């Protein structure tokens, strides 16, 4: 008996085998039972579910073109793929194992006899489901390629709508297997990741691009000036724009200065009359006037201010005014 033939697939052969199966609808033969599809961050698990999804959403509307180069992914990207899909692989393997356990038969053929009692023997071995591990992911080989998804000319309703053409970065994880005959080795796809917009190989599909495009802001864009605690130096601060919000407009230095100027009223110094000089005693004797010395402090204490400033001013009355007459008693009219 001859040994099985070993055939090492190139990355480009694996990519072409997969896209040909997707385009003609025969992708089921290339998928493993625990396969996972990530189509633009939408995950589909299981070979049957993936086959139905690709036939309904992709095969009838788009066709793979331009996949001329393929290469193995970098070690860093491989670690990212394992960290991203490791838990999904473990849960999918557990689901497959539980389905096989439920479908297994539990019937046993025993001789029917009323006289003999058959002692049931229980096995002492414990059957446990597979523990979470990344064994399947570690055994996979990963390849990547870039191409296009071009829309077919047929007018078919339904499925995905990604425009006339869409750039695709395709990453596949596969493992080597033996065909049913046992003489020829093959491979089965266990992971397929579609990413949009990437056109170069040897770069991660799971992290954002290193450089980002920055657009210059318009001159008329709304911008508020920084406050005193936000700006470092006066030289670095930019002049304020024409547009400002209400709060910034009310509490700017210009407006506060204007308010202070409006409230400021210049005080005009009133000319105080010159103090009158008291006549000397010699002049008083000549004029014959008697000068009585008055203490200012005692005069202020004895002066009654109510007499100076009455609470109600007395209005001057003319002689032609008539005093108002008001009826009292029963003669008073009631309304």
From Swiss-Prot:
Residues 266-285 have a biased composition (Low complexity). GO terms for biological process: mitotic cell cycle; regulation of cell cycle; regulation of exit from mitosis. Residues 304-320 have a biased composition (Polar residues). One of its GO terms (cellular component) is nucleus. Signal peptide: none annotated. Residues 227-237 have a biased composition (Acidic residues). Pfam families: Roughex. Disruption phenotype: Rough eye phenotype, and/or male sterility and in, some cases, pupal death. Residues 325-335 have a biased composition (Basic residues). InterPro entries: Roughex. Residues 222-291, 304-335 are annotated as: Disordered. The rux phenotype is suppressed by mutations of genes involved in cell cycle progression such as CycA and string, and enhanced by mutations of intercellular signaling genes, Ras1 and Star. Negative regulator of both mitosis and meiosis. Required for the establishment of the G1 phase in the developing eye. This is Cell cycle negative regulator roughex. The gene is rux.
């Amino acid at each position: 008996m001859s040994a099985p033939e070993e055939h090492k697939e190139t990355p480009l052969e694996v990519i072409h085998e997969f896209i040909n199966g997707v385009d003609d609808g025969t992708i089921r033969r290339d998928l493993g039972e625990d396969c996972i599809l990530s189509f633009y961050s939408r995950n589909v698990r299981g070979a049957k579910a993936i086959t139905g999804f690709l036939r309904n959403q992709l095969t009838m509307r788009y066709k793979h073109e331009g996949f001329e180069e393929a290469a193995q992914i970098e070690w860093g990207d491989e670690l990212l793929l394992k960290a991203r899909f490791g838990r999904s692989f473990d849960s999918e393997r557990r689901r497959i194992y539980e389905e096989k356990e439920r479908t297994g038969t539990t019937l046993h053929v025993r001789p029917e006899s009323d006289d003999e009692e058959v002692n049931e023997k229980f096995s002492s071995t414990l059957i446990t489901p597979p523990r979470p591990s990344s064994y399947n992911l570690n055994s996979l080989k990963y390849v990547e390629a870039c191409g296009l998804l071009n829309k077919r000319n047929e007018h078919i309703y339904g499925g995905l709508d990604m425009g006339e053409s869409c750039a695709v970065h395709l990453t596949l994880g596969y493992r080597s297997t033996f065909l049913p005959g046992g003489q020829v080795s093959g491979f089965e796809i266990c992971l397929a990741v579609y990413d949009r917009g990437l056109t170069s190989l040897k770069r991660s599909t799971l992290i954002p691009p290193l450089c980002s495009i920055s657009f210059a802001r318009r001159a008329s864009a709304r911008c508020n000036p920084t406050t005193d605690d936000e700006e470092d130096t006066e030289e670095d601060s930019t002049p304020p724009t024409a547009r400002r919000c209400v709060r910034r407009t009310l509490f700017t230095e210009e407006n506060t200065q204007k308010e202070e100027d409006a409230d400021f009223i210049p005080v005009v110094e009133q000319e105080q009359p010159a103090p009158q000089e008291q006549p000397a005693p010699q002049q008083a004797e000549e004029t014959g006037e008697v000068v009585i010395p008055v203490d200012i402090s005692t005069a202020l204490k004895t002066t009654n201010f109510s007499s100076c400033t009455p609470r109600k001013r007395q209005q001057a009355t003319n002689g032609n005014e008539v005093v108002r007459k008001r009826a009292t008693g029963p003669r008073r009219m009631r309304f």
